[in-house]
Structure formats: structure tokens, C-alpha cells
Amino acid sequence: MSYSVSAAQLWSRKLAMQAEDMQQHQKSQSNQIASCLAEMNTKQEVVNQTIGQLGRSISEVQQQNSQLVLQSLNQINMSMQQVALGIQDYASRINKLEQTMSDMNLKFEALQKEQNSNTKTLADCTSQMTIITKKLDAELKKRYMTTKQTRTVQNQTMPRSNTTTKKRVLAIDFLADDDY
């Protein structure tokens, strides 16, 4: 029996060694699983942090984009208002300019009518002056002829100078022009 005890001992030792090997194997597998789980947890935390950072970044970018869009829309709105005001100002200036032009056209037409009437008046005055000048010339010739024919002997000895006669003719013309 000692052989069988020894076989039983061997067998129990073998089983104990196998159990110990299995325990160590399970322990190493448990350690590997624990380290794998720890690594997965750390990686999950990194992923969660990255996802959180990405989420925050996305929300920040969305906020910035929405702010930029709002600012751009406000600037466009202000620009449109300025353009509208500019157009209104331009339209009022054009209206004033058109009004000024129509006023100037009316004044120009009035000036043309006045000029036409003045031209007619001037033409009438010129024709009247021509008639008056012809009459005066005729009267002067008559006077000159009568004065020459009725000269006395004393006057004939002292002939008049040309300048005195010219002065008299100019004086008569001057008086005729002023309607004296």
C-alpha cells in the first residue's frame, strides 16, 4: 500500500500542482483581464474626455458661428439701412435737382420771352431811330442850306470853321437821341 499511498500522494500532489497551476493560470488570466479592463477603462475615459472636448469644441464653434452669422446679419441689415437712406437722400437730391431744373427752364423761357420782346422793342426803337435820324438829317440839310443861303455879307467874310459846324451837328444829334 505504500505504493498506492505514494501513488495517491503523487496523484494528490499532481492534482495540487495542477490546481496550483490552474490557480496561477486563473490568477494571471484575472490579472490580464483586470489590466485589460483597466486599460479599457483608461481608454474609455480618454475617449469620453475626447468626446467631451469635441462636444465642447463643437458647441463653441456653433456659438461662434451663430455669433458671426448674427453679426454678419446685423452688419448686412445696417448696410442695407444705410443704402436705403442713401437712396432716399439721392432721390430727394434728384427731385430737388429736377425741381431746380424746371424752375430754371421756366426762368429761361421767361427770359427768352423778355429777350424776344426786348428784341422787338429794340427793332422798333431802331426803326424809329432810323426814321428820326433820317428826319434829322433832312432837317439839318435844310437848316444848313437855309443858313448858307441867307448869310449876310458880314458872315460871309468870316467863314465858320469846320469844327464849330461839327459841334453843332453833334449837339443836335445828342439832343435828338435824348428826345429833348
UniProtKB/Swiss-Prot annotation:
Disruption phenotype: Abolishes localization of hop1 to DNA double-strand break (DSB) hotspots. It comes from the Eukaryota. One of its GO terms (cellular component) is nucleus. Coiled coil: none annotated. It is found in: Nucleus; Chromosome. One of its GO terms (biological process) is reciprocal meiotic recombination. The keyword Acetylation does not apply. Keywords: Chromosome, Meiosis, Nucleus. The keyword Translocase does not apply. Required during the early stages of meiosis for meiotic recombination. Homomer. Interacts (via C-terminus) with hop1 (via C-terminus); the interaction is direct. Interacts (via C-terminus) with rec10; the interaction is direct. Interacts with mde2; the interaction is direct. This is Meiotic recombination protein rec15. The gene is rec15.
